[in-house]
């Protein structure tokens, strides 16, 4: 039994000891396939799994997200997953783990894949059919399935043999026979791709070529992945026979040729198909062309853009992945797209003259960084409609406001009663990812004076779904949506076009079609490099020049994942970059040019120019390494390897040549440069960071005829240990200075208490100096001093109310998804935390000190050391964020270590004449009387408040300072009293909202046990009727990506409803009786289709008497005496028939006639056979079906009559909501 005090206890959540505030997507919110953070988290898990040998578990989680949770798009995840291609992985390579991702049935995890799991090829078929605007024929299905079945068999053999080798300890532990078996499988797979790939795009029919291209793109990716493994892992597998150095050189040639071939093929087939659509003349042709572009982009072009990254010479294996951002935008097919019920799109003109950046389909579409959506303003008008002459809206115009301008599509209403306008405010942090619309296609019943031109798709209902699953209502009636357009996964609506219908009367000009611009979420992120992951790996980053802040002209490209920037002679372009980690980076540029062009390249860090020189960008026309696209052949050019400091900087590029230059992207490859053999200037560059846990192949290279004036270099992966040589103190003066500083850490006359003003960072500065004392000269002294410093550190930890103030206990902190701890910083002895730029996830750390740790009427000091910070907010709160400061701290360079001077930075004078350290912060917070019941404690957090901000912080402390004076006690009592009043007011409000819901959910379950079984008489409607309340604070006050206490309550409510719903689904004989999976499991006749009601519910709509759905069920352990109950919830006039019997057919008919949503039942049904066909039909006009269930009747009691009773209950406008 759930009771109020369990869900909403008198003591709020205990941050450290109890269940912590969980991340929003992990606690029952409506995660959507648009949420890029979910893909990033699953990708991190896969990366860890590949290196740890647990990748099958990571892939199982992905498959669950795809086929069970419906939060992951298969195609999108695979595409993002290819960024792992450059990882330094074990000898299994990258292809083996991906087999289980491409073919769900081959993922060797303990738990079987979801029962509805498909391979990626089968999962593509609905999109392919949508693209070619028809279903696949039986011959086409046979052809595609046969080819993929052959590949799956070969992949399974490859995987099985690799598993066998690994089970024996690896390639150096098995005999030559098993190695030969494996290499045979490798070569067989390679031959399959070489031989069979062309058959997918060589056919006499255009449709066959187009439908085969998505298969071709995936298969080409698989082949290039296999070839890369052969090149990088082949010498480990079999260096003597099949993968000798000469053979590897041959495979290198193959991968380069195939990258060009596969890219050209996809581009040529796409362009040929695109040309066949011509210039759209009406909405019908426009919709088909845009759908073709959308699916070809997400299923083909987005894969082809990654092909060059498979070349290990161009993108060598390191310990980090590769991230090449895409900025290309996609136009949706026009909305509405349904053509049933009399809506004809042929010959319906489309007017694009008012569309910014459209340029007849050849433009770049509105730049999402320049035009940020702010608001939609809708202008509806009203006409007589259904059900007793009620007025129904239709949309005349929509006004789109962005950060640049306001633009009107359509015209303001001139006829009929007018209402509105209605406003839809848009939150850029929670963008729109789905548009739901209803359109009139036939005159409503009883509508007098109806104008037939309004039959051509007038909008009568409109709403929008946001990324977090919440819905924005446009304030229009209609109640449901017959058109649902979901933007491609990980995209958002960055702009909205509209087009009017042109008619010959005064209804001309009303808006009937909307066109959305879909933009990848990463397109608006700042350009960040040097951000390490949890293992310290730094990714290679590539940013489209389309993200430049000035200069150049946007030109269309299809294969790059971004439009190119054309730089005419004399023009310049600048792109802003933020570097998180001071580091060496190889700066590269991908470009195309028809002739040689001198280019001035300037990397401007604001105080230096690591690159400031003219560089020749050679003609790429005849390049053997390039990929030909719309504006030329694109190649990657290395500019220079330089050290770039942490912070923001600009890259400026000026075309000083005489012909156009086309810039695709700029890349930053993290490097460490080691210098060997100073006499002959031989240098070795290796990818950073070095992973000393990996086993690398040693390649010996002889260099002869070295020219000391012209150093030569080699690129390789180097595994080594680099000793950090600290200075050594050898004089008695050094010893006296350091001894004095060690003694100064303690209060006078004791070594059991720290001095009053000593911070944790002070102790760490001293230990650096102690460690630098010479072992040979001062060994005994050093040991004694180090013992004292260790004692000081223990005392510091003991007084610190924070757990893990130097991050020795990282689990004690709440942190943003991308926040990491880092070691080996010149200013820190201990680990420090790196707060990176926020990106899609907030960047923070947070901890709460519980009330039980505090003393009454006491002042506490909150302090810490900041090595570097840009836009770092420091928040300390007890009664309401008493301390809230945003600080900027310059990058702290370590001074040469001396025995007397500071480690970092020259102290500056403060207002009271003392010396202060700009890197050290210290604040005070007062605690009055203790309040154990409400447990306010002291909450402490650091977070980044701007997109390009960052910080490195450590030595965080909350420690007791002194007792409060009398006047300070009075002040804090007044603040505490006000806080308690507001707290109790909100608590009373929340209690009044949640107690009724607790009571209703208790009523669903036997013995009111939310983890037990639901009662036998529970129906879908009982669950749907429970409307979750809108609580005032669902998100944590500081951690915006986590639930508050109230949010956790809502998650528990939703979890209990979900469990009840799942049990009901298991108990009913009908599959998908709630129509949550569209009309799956039902046979449709006529125009039965799903719509979305205004409250967000998805229901089945039967528009007239010619529409019906049916389902045949088979009862296990059939008993003709067993009784069943039919429960139906719907609106309108219709019937449910149940046909059963073998030799003699019996039909049971249940009639449902209700103007509002109502539950009706038929009890005590018996059947004459184990097969029953259930049919739902409309009798007259629109019939809306919310849910239907057929369940075993409970055993009757004495006062029950089961003679086919019929009952009903009315419940209009009810829903199961999860308000955010």
Swiss-Prot record:
Q: Which UniProt keywords apply?
A: Sporulation, Toxin, Virulence
Q: Report biased composition (Polar residues) as residue ranges.
A: 1198-1220
Q: Which Gene3D superfamilies is this protein grouped with?
A: Galactose-binding domain-like, Pesticidal crystal protein, N-terminal domain
**Which one Pfam family would you cite for this protein?**
Endotoxin_C
Q: Where is this region: Disordered?
A: 1194-1220
Q: Which InterPro entries match?
A: Cry_V, Galactose-bd-like_sf, Pest_crys_dom-III, Pest_crys_dom_I, Pest_crys_N_sf
Q: Name one GO molecular function term.
A: toxin activity
Q: Which GO terms describe its biological process?
A: sporulation resulting in formation of a cellular spore; symbiont-mediated killing of host cell
Q: Does the keyword Oxidoreductase apply?
A: no
Q: Which family does it belong to?
A: Belongs to the delta endotoxin family.
The extra comment attached to this record reads: Toxic segment of the protein is located in the N-terminus.
What the protein does comes down to: Promotes colloidosmotic lysis by binding to the midgut epithelial cells of hymenopteran species.
What is the name of this protein?
Pesticidal crystal protein Cry5Ac
Q: Which organism is it from?
A: Bacillus thuringiensis
């Amino acid at each position: 039994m759930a009771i109020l005090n369990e869900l909403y206890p008198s003591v709020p959540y205990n941050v450290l000891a109890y269940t912590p505030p969980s991340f929003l997507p992990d606690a029952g919110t409506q995660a959507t396939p648009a949420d890029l953070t979910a893909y990033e988290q699953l990708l991190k898990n896969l990366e860890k799994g590949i290196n740890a040998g647990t990748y099958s578990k990571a892939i199982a989680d992905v498959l669950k997200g795809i086929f069970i949770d419906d939060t992951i798009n298969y195609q999108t995840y695979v595409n993002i997953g290819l960024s792992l291609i450059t990882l330094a992985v074990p000898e299994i390579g990258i292809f083996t783990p991906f087999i289980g991702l491409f073919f769900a049935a081959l993922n060797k995890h303990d738990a079987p894949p979801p029962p509805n799991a498909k391979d990626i090829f089968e999962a593509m078929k609905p999109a392919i059919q949508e693209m070619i605007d028809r279903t696949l024929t039986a011959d086409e299905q046979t052809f595609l399935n046969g080819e993929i079945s052959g590949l799956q068999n070969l992949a399974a053999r490859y995987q099985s043999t690799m598993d066998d080798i690994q089970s024996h300890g690896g390639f150096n532990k098995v005999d030559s026979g098993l190695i030969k078996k494996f290499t045979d499988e490798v070569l067989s797979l390679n031959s399959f791709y070489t031989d069979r790939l062309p058959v997918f795009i060589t056919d006499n029919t255009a449709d066959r070529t187009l439908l085969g291209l998505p298969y071709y793109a995936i298969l080409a990716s698989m082949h290039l992945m296999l070839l890369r493994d052969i090149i990088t892992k082949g010498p480990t597998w079999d260096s003597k026979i099949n993968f000798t150095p000469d053979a590897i050189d041959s495979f290198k040639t193959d991968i380069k040729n195939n990258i060009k071939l596969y890219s050209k093929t996809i581009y040529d087939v796409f362009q040929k198909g695109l040309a066949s659509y011509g210039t759209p003349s009406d909405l019908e042709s426009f919709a088909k062309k845009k759908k073709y572009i959308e699916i070809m982009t997400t299923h083909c072009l987005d894969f082809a853009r990654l092909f060059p990254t498979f070349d290990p010479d161009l993108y060598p294996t390191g310990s980090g992945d590769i991230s090449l951002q895409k900025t290309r935008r996609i136009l949706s097919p026009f909305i509405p797209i349904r053509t049933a019920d009399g809506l004809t799109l042929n010959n319906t003109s489309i007017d694009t003259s008012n569309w910014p950046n459209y340029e007849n389909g050849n433009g770049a579409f509105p730049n999402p960084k320049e035009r940020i959506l702010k608001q939609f303003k809708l202008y509806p008008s009203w006409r007589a409609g259904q059900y007793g002459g009620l007025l129904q809206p239709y949309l005349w115009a929509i006004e789109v406001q962005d950060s640049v301008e306001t633009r009107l599509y359509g015209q303001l209403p001139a006829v009929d009663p007018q209402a509105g306008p209605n406003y839809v405010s848009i939150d850029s942090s929670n963008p729109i990812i789905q548009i739901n619309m209803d359109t009139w296609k036939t005159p409503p019943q009883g509508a007098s004076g109806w104008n037939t031109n309004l039959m051509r798709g007038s909008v009568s209902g409109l709403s929008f779904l946001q990324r977090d699953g919440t819905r924005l209502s446009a304030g229009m009636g209609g109640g449901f949506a017959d058109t649902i357009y979901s933007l491609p996964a990980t995209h958002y609506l960055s702009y909205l076009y509209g087009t009017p219908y042109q008619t010959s009367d005064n209804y001309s000009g009303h808006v009937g079609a909307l066109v959305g611009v879909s933009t990848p979420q990463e397109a608006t992120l700042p350009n960040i490099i040097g951000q390490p992951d949890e293992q310290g790996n730094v990714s290679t980053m590539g940013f489209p020049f389309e993200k430049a802040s000035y200069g150049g002209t946007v030109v269309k490209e299809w294969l790059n994942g971004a439009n190119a920037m054309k730089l005419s002679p004399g023009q310049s372009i600048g792109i802003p970059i933020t570097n998180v980690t001071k580091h060496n980076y190889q700066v590269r540029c991908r470009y195309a040019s028809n002739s040689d062009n001198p280019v001035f390249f300037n990397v401007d860090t604001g105080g230096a120019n690591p690159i400031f020189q003219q560089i020749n960008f050679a003609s790429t026309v005849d390049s053997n390494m390039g990929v030909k696209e719309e504006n030329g052949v694109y190649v990657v050019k290395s500019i220079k390897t330089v050290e770039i400091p942490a912070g923001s900087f600009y890259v400026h590029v000026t075309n000083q040549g005489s012909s156009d230059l086309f810039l695709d992207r700029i890349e930053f490859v993290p490097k460490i440069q080691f210098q060997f053999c100073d006499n002959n200037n031989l240098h070795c560059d290796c990818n950073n960071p070095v992973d000393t846990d990996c086993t690398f192949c040693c390649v010996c290279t002889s260099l002869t005829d070295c020219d000391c004036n012209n150093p030569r270099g080699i690129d390789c992966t180097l595994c080594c240990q680099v000793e950090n040589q600290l200075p050594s103190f050898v004089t008695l003066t050094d010893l006296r200075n350091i001894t004095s500083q060690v003694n100064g850490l303690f209060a006078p006359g004791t070594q059991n208490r720290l001095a009053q003003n000593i911070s944790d960072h002070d102790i760490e500065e001293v230990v650096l100096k102690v460690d630098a004392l010479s072992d040979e000269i001062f060994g005994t002294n050093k040991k004694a001093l180090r013992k004292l410093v260790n004692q000081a550190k223990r005392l510091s930890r003991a007084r610190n109310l924070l757990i893990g103030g130097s991050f020795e206990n990282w689990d004690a902190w709440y942190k943003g998804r991308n926040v990491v701890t880092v070691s080996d910083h010149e200013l820190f002895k201990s680990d420090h935390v790196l707060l990176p730029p926020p990106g899609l996830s907030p960047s923070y750390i947070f901890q709460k000190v519980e009330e039980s740790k505090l003393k009454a009427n006491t002042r506490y000091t909150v302090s810490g050391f900041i090595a570097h910070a840009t836009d770092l907010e420091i928040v300390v709160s007890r009664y309401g964020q008493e301390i809230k400061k945003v600080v900027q701290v310059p990058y702290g360079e370590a001074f040469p270590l001396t025995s007397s001077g500071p480690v970092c930075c020259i102290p500056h004078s403060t207002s009271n004449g003392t010396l202060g350290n700009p890197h050290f912060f210290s604040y005070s917070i007062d605690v009055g009387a203790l309040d154990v019941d409400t447990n306010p404690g002291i909450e402490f957090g650091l977070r980044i408040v701007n997109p390009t901000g960052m910080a490195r912080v450590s030595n965080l402390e909350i420690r007791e300072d002194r007792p409060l004076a009398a006047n300070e006690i009075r002040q804090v009592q007044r603040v505490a009293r006000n806080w308690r009043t507001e707290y109790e007011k909100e608590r009373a409000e929340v209690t009044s909202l949640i107690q009724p819901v607790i009571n209703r959910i208790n009523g669903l379950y036997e013995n009111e046990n939310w983890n037990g079984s639901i009662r036998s008489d529970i129906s879908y409607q009982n669950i749907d009727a429970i409307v979750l309340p809108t609580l005032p604070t669902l998100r944590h006050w500081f951690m915006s990506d986590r639930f508050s206490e109230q949010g956790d309550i809502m998650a528990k409510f939703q979890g209990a409803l979900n469990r009840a719903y799942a049990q009901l689904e298991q108990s009913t004989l009908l599959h998908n009786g709630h129509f949550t999976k569209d009309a799956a499991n039902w046979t449709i006749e006529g125009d039965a289709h799903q719509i979305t009601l205004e409250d967000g519910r998805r229901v089945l709509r039967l528009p007239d008497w010619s529409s019906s759905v049916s389902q045949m069920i088979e009862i296990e352990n059939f008993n003709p005496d067993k009784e069943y109950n039919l429960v139906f919830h719907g609106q309108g006039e219709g019937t449910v028939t149940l046909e059963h019997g073998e030799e003699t057919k019996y039909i049971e008919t249940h009639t449902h006639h209700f103007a509002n949503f109502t539950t009706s039942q038929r009890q005590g049904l018996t059947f004459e056979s184990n097969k029953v066909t259930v049919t739902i039909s409309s009798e007259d006009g629109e019939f809306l079906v919310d849910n239907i269930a057929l369940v075993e009747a409970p055993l009757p009691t004495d006062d029950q009559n089961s003679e086919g009773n019929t009952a009903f209950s009315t419940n209009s406008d009810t829903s199961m909501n999860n308000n955010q």
